[in-house]
A protein has these predicted regions:
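N-terminal prepro-regions of secreted/extracellular proteins
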Residues: 1-55
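Mature secreted bioactive peptide module from preproproteins
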Residues: 36-156
Length: 156
């Protein structure tokens, strides 16, 4: 590979260096069963989750990762079970690759609510003049309150 000039190095850094992290919630249905779940009128199961987009300094998406869970119980009273239905990651950005799950998904009761964690591995395989992030493990940690509210963060 030919040596890069300073301007090219600056562009490459901006294109491949992680910047802002965007969090998107899964769309929530507005049907009657979801309303019943929200009002705590009956035991019910529903899906929830989040999708995270890791942006580069330049604004392009480096990679995405997600978590989808099923929440069962009577919100406001008791969450009986939470299980991970789907999790994973993907990238189509040059120099980045998705390496799979970092560990098995975990979900367990905490007090009156639940906690769920999934983790994914990404790698930036090319290093040019010191540019490259190496391997990154990213996580989605979610808490589910007795009300049924799902809150996700990127903390590992």
């Amino acid at each position: 590979m030919a040596e890069l000039d300073n301007h090219q190095k600056s562009l490459l850094r901006a294109y491949t260096t992680p910047g802002e992290l965007i969090v998107k919630r899964l769309p929530q249905p507005s049907n009657l069963s979801t309303k019943l779940f929200a009002q705590g009128e009956a035991d019910y199961c529903r899906k929830d989750g989040a999708r995270f987009e890791q942006k580069a300094v330049m604004g392009n998406t480096l990679y995405t990762y997600w978590q989808t869970v099923e929440i069962c119980g009577t919100p406001g009273k008791k969450i009986k079970n939470v299980k991970v239905l789907d999790h994973g990651g993907e990238t189509s950005t040059p120099t980045w690759s998705y390496r799979g799950s970092a560990s098995n998904p975990a979900s367990y009761a905490v007090g009156a609510g639940w906690f769920v964690r999934t983790s994914e591995n990404f790698e930036q395989s090319i290093v040019v003049d010191g540019i490259g992030a190496g391997q990154r493990t990213v996580c989605i940690s979610a808490t589910i309150r007795p009300s049924g509210e799902y809150n996700a963060s990127e903390r590992c």
